[in-house]
Design a protein with these regions (language model features):
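Conserved nucleotide-ligand handling architecture
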Residues: 1-151
Length: 151
């Protein structure tokens, strides 16, 4: 389960300190970032000296359906090219995964988007960042990423 394995592994919190109270309520000491999609929550708390960011999205969200939506403005030329290499049915989920990476990276940096989201490179991870794809740990139809900055 994401809350019992992924978050403690990256934050250093013991698994018992991350509590899933219900599908809509998570208790985690000092949680400062969280992603919510429907009834699912993914909290994140940075340890001392670390930045932590998490994002979860629906793979079938309208924003990721084609390049005319977020895909046309939120992604770099290289990111759009990478998505175009995939079969058409896989492209919306690929856009959603790229977006969750971007969101996790800017949250871990503590900046949010300060300019053009296309300028945030979701294909190349900075040396001081650990980026984890959470998709396999989420219910079907959801994609997510968690980034930890600092050592």
């Amino acid at each position: 389960m994401l809350f019992r394995s992924g978050v403690p592994a990256l934050t250093g919190l013991p698994p018992g300190r991350v509590a899933l109270v219900s599908f809509t309520h998570v208790r985690m000491p000092g949680a400062e970032d969280r992603a919510r999609i429907g009834a699912w929550w993914a909290p994140a708390r940075p340890a001392d000296g670390l930045g932590l960011g998490v994002d979860v999205e629906r793979a079938d969200a309208a924003a990721f359906a084609d390049e005319d939506g977020l895909g046309g403005v939120g992604f770099s030329t290289a990111e759009r090219a990478r998505v175009r290499e995939l079969p058409a049915p896989e492209r919306p989920a690929a856009r959603a995964r790229l977006w969750t990476r971007k969101e996790a990276l800017v949250k871990a940096a503590g900046t949010g988007f300060t300019g053009d989201p296309a300028a945030v490179d979701a294909l190349t991870v900075p040396a001081d960042v650990v980026l984890v794809d959470l998709t396999d740990r989420l219910p079907g139809g959801l994609v997510g990423a968690l980034a930890r900055r600092g050592r």
